[in-house]
Swiss-Prot record:
GO terms for biological process: regulation of DNA-templated transcription. Belongs to the TACO1 family. InterPro entries: Integrase-like_N, TACO1_YebC-like_2nd/3rd_dom, TACO1_YebC_N, Transcrip_reg_TACO1-like, Transcrip_reg_TACO1-like_dom3, YebC-like. HAMAP family: Transcrip_reg_TACO1 (MF_00693). One of its GO terms (molecular function) is DNA binding. NCBIfam families: PRK12378.1. It is found in: Cytoplasm. This is Probable transcriptional regulatory protein PSPPH_2212. Keywords: Cytoplasm, DNA-binding, Transcription, Transcription regulation. It comes from the Bacteria. Gene3D superfamilies: 1.10.10.200, 3.30.70.980. Pfam families: TACO1_YebC_N, Transcrip_reg. PANTHER family: TRANSLATIONAL ACTIVATOR OF CYTOCHROME C OXIDASE 1.
Amino acid sequence: MGAQWKVKHKEAAANAKGRTFGKLSKEIMIAARAGADPDMNSRLRLVVEQAKKASMPRETLERAIKKGAGLLGESVNFERLTYEGFAPHRVPVIVECLTDNINRTVSEIRVLFRKGQLGAAGSVSWDFLYQGMIEAVPAAADADPELAAIEAGAQDFESAEEGATLFLTESTDMDAVCKALPEFGFTVQSAQLGYRPKSTVDGLTEEQMAEVEAFLEAIDNHDDVQNVYVGLAG
């Protein structure tokens, strides 16, 4: 599993679609503070690519951009919070939040972590890499992911779902690699900064795995949670 946790069960995944749009809308609004034109705002461009991949309705996407850029006369005040700790059975977890009420979020996340263990800053992040993660698909049959990774400046690459390739970059290089990949036969579908575990917990029983997944799903269901990263094998 390692890296970003995703809902596994079909019914839960279907119900998560609306939450995904809500999370992306927050990211779009924050990015759009620096300008509403994705061509002039690299951070906004990358989030818009994620939103399109998730099939966010165009009207929702455009409204989020306008709201974030202040074109609708509404202010956007979100703060970023990051929590570290452990799920049941000492599985390391990093949780990223965007909130308009820090006190509420802190209190509610503490409650959710009662079935695990909330740690201090640095308690588990030392065992994760903060990287750019670019998902791209070949635009031509002869596109070579290894060559593309080398030439575009990615650190590494690995196979992703549905024939895509995941290119891994230094956090500061992600935008440059995104721009370079099309030259080497790859179309970028999404790009984001996030955490990847250096090592993962394995050997859990079916019952233990169910406890971990229930914990992660409860965390991910919280309205202020944007991303959940976990060091879990499988």
